[in-house]
Amino acid sequence: MLNMRDVDISGKRVLIRVDVNVPLDANLNITDDTRIRAVLPSINYALDEGAKVIIASHMGRPKGQVVPELSMAPVAKRFKRLLKKEVELAPDSVGPEVKAMVEKMKDGDVIMLENLRFHQAEIDNDDAFAKELASLCDVYINNAFAVAHRKNASVVAITRHAPVCAAGFLLQSELNYFAKAMNDPARPLVAIIGGAKVSSKLGALHHMLQHVDKFVVGGAMASTFLKSVDYNVGKSKVEDDLLWEARSLMKRATMQGTAFYIPVDAVVADRFSPDAESKIVPIREIPPEWMIMDIGPATALLYSEVLASAKTIIWNGPMGVFEMDAFSRGTMSMVNYVANSYALSIIGGGDTDVAIHKAGETHRITYISTGGGAFLALMEGKTLPAVAALERHQAKI
């Protein structure tokens, strides 16, 4: 797979696919521009090389309809501020008006295409739409790790038509960090897996079990593991159809010598509410009508001891309902332990990055992935469609 440094982009029309699907408030102001800042190195490199830069992205889920509230206008405005140069917003992502704008570009100019998902063809990986997108450029750069797991026209089909295709710095960096952590890790390698459902992490759990030395489990999904070994978890959310699978995973871990840690105590509540009555109880003493909302202090201490010896940490998913302050302590404790660790730490998806930002510890984490689903797909051992498309293109030429 080519990197953008490997191709000549001087004076060329360079379409850079990014994922700047950023959160907006009610007034359409950007509340977190992390994803925008993450793609700046690739854009600045292209500009320094004298390219004509065309930025393409999506925003939200407009389902193939033009939704004014999901326009790329706020993003174009933020790019203008960060790049310190004019960034013109195109009226669409394809069409004669866009084509005319591109033809008038001079070296060093920047255009931002309108929301790609205003066209259903983008979601459908439509070849004709991809061909029209590709006609705008001489070089296509995929720098959108967060959608690298999706078979969209601007991610996959476009590589069949663009003359030259390569990976941007962000995409390459994401892949390199994960590959190092999985294929050549400093050990012990500890995986922290949290979040709501075992079902959504099952593939990752199976694949990671082949690589990690220790597993740490939290979040609502821990309830399924706890019940699978006969703990009463009250009214906690449990995936009963996966109890055998959960028990089997733990047994497999034991047989191969991989430590598998589940909570020993929990913060439980009488209802799912920020102002619910709550208390800390040992796992064996969860009241029948109560539910687990967070890991308890004894569990946090146990997990801190596991992390203390770690040399590599991969974390996906919070330890509890951390968006409710009353049940955020477990996740925030883990953030603190990981941040204070000397291990190479990689954080990705499952709102874990939100917790890191909330705690103000981003600067103490080795790498925070911009991808959720894409990061999980790597944890499952899958080849990302975006990467496969770039590799096919290189093989063809």
UniProtKB/Swiss-Prot annotation:
List localization entries.
Cytoplasm
Query: In the record, what terms sit under GO molecular function?
Result: ADP binding; ATP binding; phosphoglycerate kinase activity
Keyword set includes Disulfide bond: no
Question: Which branch of life, at top level?
Answer: Bacteria
Report the Gene3D superfamilies cross-referenced here. Phosphoglycerate kinase, N-terminal domain
* InterPro entries, per the entry: Phosphoglycerate_kinase, Phosphoglycerate_kinase_CS, Phosphoglycerate_kinase_N, Phosphoglycerate_kinase_sf
Pathway(s) annotated for this protein in UniProt: Carbohydrate degradation; glycolysis; pyruvate from D-glyceraldehyde 3-phosphate: step 2/5
Name the residues that bind substrate: D19, V20, N21, R35, H58, M59, G60, R61, R117, R150
Q: Which GO terms describe its biological process?
A: gluconeogenesis; glycolytic process
**Major subcellular site:** cytoplasm
| Catalysis performed (reactions) | (2R)-3-phosphoglycerate + ATP = (2R)-3-phospho-glyceroyl phosphate + ADP
EC number of this enzyme:
2.7.2.3
Tell me the keywords, alphabetical order.
ATP-binding, Cytoplasm, Glycolysis, Kinase, Nucleotide-binding, Transferase
GO CC term, one of those recorded: cytosol
Residues that hold ATP according to the record:
K201, E323, G349, G350, D351, T352
UniProt similarity note? Belongs to the phosphoglycerate kinase family.
Q: Which PANTHER family match?
A: PHOSPHOGLYCERATE KINASE, PHOSPHOGLYCERATE KINASE 1, CHLOROPLASTIC-RELATED
Q: How does it assemble?
A: Monomer.
Q: Any idea what this protein is called?
A: Phosphoglycerate kinase
Q: Which organism is it from?
A: Desulfatibacillum aliphaticivorans
The organism that produces this protein has a lineage beginning with: Bacteria, Pseudomonadati, Thermodesulfobacteriota, Desulfobacteria, Desulfobacterales
Gene that encodes the chain: pgk
